[in-house]
Amino acid sequence: MHNPTPRTESPNALAFIKRFFAAEAAGGLILMAAALAALIVANSPLADSYFAALHTVLAGMSVEHWINDGLMAIFFMLVGLEIKREMLAGQLASWSQRALPGFAALGGMVVPALIYVAFNWGQPETIGGWAIPAATDIAFALGVLSLLGKRVPLSLKIFLSALAILDDLGAVLIIALFYTSDLSIPMLLAALGSIAVLVALNRLGVKKLLPYLLIGALLWFFMLQSGIHATLAGVALALCIPLGKADEEASSPLLHLEEKLHPWVAFAVVPIFGFANAGVSLAGITVDKLVDPVPLGVALGLLIGKQVGIFALAALAIRAGLARLPDGSNWGQLYGVAALCGIGFTMSLFIGALAFPGAPALVDEVKVGVLIGSVFSALLGVVVLRRFGARG
């Protein structure tokens, strides 16, 4: 693949980053509205119609399945495009740039998982959900961050974005390694063949997007049938899209596709996913239910594990001289961003559905834990950033 050398951000690239944050932030606010609407509908007289619609079968799969395996492949494709762009020519282009978000992302995945495991140890039916609190929802987090305006320096927003992208990369690897069902070898070979064709297109210097997208659609089908989660086709396709000239959208297939996908993902795909997956009936939720191992492990993994893991490892890296605070920021702001990373919504709900297939009661417990952990993480992050923002 084409590997441009790290560079100083051009005005075009800076404009692209500003559009990126604007779309993510606005998309995060719409996602909040979609999640709230799902909760209201799921606890209203429309609840039966809501759940019936999600379970309606179209072309052999339920609507919910189409959303989680189909639409979310587009979300994961965008994640893959962001990872590749940042790794080759962006905020993660060198090891020094990767150090702070890298250490932070590692802590933000390991500590929440350990907290979940601590609450679910010895429970084979629930221990498989250990990865649920290990993910950060970049759209939600940036949406909340946008409410604080100029109290938060751009460097912190870039840090949060880089951290979340590495977090997403970790989540993709977790899904591939730990949440893959029984494999169909013929379909897996067909998927690998599709990836080989995509790599060949890249090596041959093909810049037209249509051949990549057509082969990518085949790859999605083969992965769906292979037992590997179909959304990973989006990541594989994205990593094969050529970057070209990273400072010119017109000559960069990757930037062009990323620019086209952003509004669709931010304003359609993710809100639809949120509306389809956040709906949970609260009728049977009691205090006793809230302290069950799954919701407690998920909620505390997000609320406590994220902020402790991210802040502790980031501070360790800074104190050891391996990284430095983002420009114009302070320790309080870094802690506030660490707290915001406890907003796990989209990826946490997604992993929850993979962890407990055929166990709707456990999936509902995951939803409650994710909602509680995410809401309190958002509130804590806002309070801390408002307190320390004037010094940013």
From Swiss-Prot:
InterPro entries: Na/H_antiporter_dom_sf, NhaA. It is found in: Cell inner membrane. It comes from the Bacteria. The chain crosses the membrane at residues 20-40, 63-83, 99-119, 127-147, 158-178, 181-201, 209-229, 265-285, 298-318, 336-356, 365-385. Signal peptide: none annotated. Na(+)/H(+) antiporter that extrudes sodium in exchange for external protons. GO terms for biological process: regulation of pH. GO terms for cellular component: plasma membrane. The lineage of its organism: Bacteria, Pseudomonadati, Pseudomonadota, Gammaproteobacteria, Pseudomonadales. This is Na(+)/H(+) antiporter NhaA 1. Belongs to the NhaA Na(+)/H(+) (TC 2.A.33) antiporter family. GO terms for molecular function: sodium:proton antiporter activity. It is a multi-pass membrane protein. Keywords: Antiport, Cell inner membrane, Cell membrane, Ion transport, Membrane, Sodium, Sodium transport, Transmembrane, Transmembrane helix, Transport. PANTHER family: NA(+)_H(+) ANTIPORTER NHAA, SODIUM ION/PROTON ANTIPORTER NHAA-RELATED. It catalyses: Na(+)(in) + 2 H(+)(out) = Na(+)(out) + 2 H(+)(in).
